[in-house]
Amino acid sequence: MKIALVGEGIMSIPPEGWGGVEHLIWNFHNQLKKEGDDVTIINTKDLHKIVNTINDGKFDAVHLHYDQYANIIPYLNCKKKMITSHYPYLENPEPQYTFLYDLLKNSGAHIISLSDKIKEEFLRRGIDSTNVSVLPCGIDTNSYVIDDEALYPNRSVVVGKIEPRKRQAYLQKLNLNIDFIGNNTDSSFDISDTCYYGEQSKQDIMDN
């Protein structure tokens, strides 16, 4: 199958450092290629270029990974059209972002949710169950060095940007033998705590 994955066009794919959505698209790209699919990543802010590239490429399927580009869906000549919103508060959006549900519902594309809870929220808002699927996300474990015996079997580590919505500060206060790696943007997170290892490069994390 010939598949197009469409990114936001702000960061490179794969990203040079952090970039959750960009890593996700890259992992999808690699996994689909392993399955024998012909996969192209289109990563630009130029909407006309996206439409022309997809229509000229005669793709069997397209998966749009940026909700703000939903209005181009009707102009795509493709049998299978899918769209995913990566807005982090989609399960409980602020009032100014509830429009995203109608935007995706009326896009004409099949909605791919990142979790069961997000799918349930779409259904609660009147979107037909046949037009919503769930595609769980994760990491490519083959890219990480995994030791057979853990150096610290009684500890876990949370990797990622530290921010209020992810509630690392809450976990930190529970003293649950959890370490944290990532750049901090949460004033309630205690960066002097010995469980905080600061920001590390992606390569260091994969190698260690």
Stretch-by-stretch model annotation:
Residues 64-69, 85:
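Short His-centered aromatic/hydrophobic patch
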Residues 1-44, 57:
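N-terminal subdomain of nucleotide-sugar transferases
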Residues 117, 138:
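Carbohydrate-associated surface elements
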Residues 89, 93-111:
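Membrane-proximal helix-turn-helix segments that form the acceptor-binding/catalytic region
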Residues 112, 149-166, 170-179:
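Conserved donor-binding/catalytic core segment of Leloir-type glycosyltransferases
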Residues 62-63, 107-116:
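A short beta-strand/loop micro-motif in the catalytic core of glycosyltransferases
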Residues 183-184, 192-208:
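Conserved active-site histidine-acidic residue motif and adjacent donor-binding/catalytic loop
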Residues 9-11, 159-164, 184, 200:
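Short donor-sugar binding/catalytic loops of nucleotide-sugar-dependent glycosyltransferases
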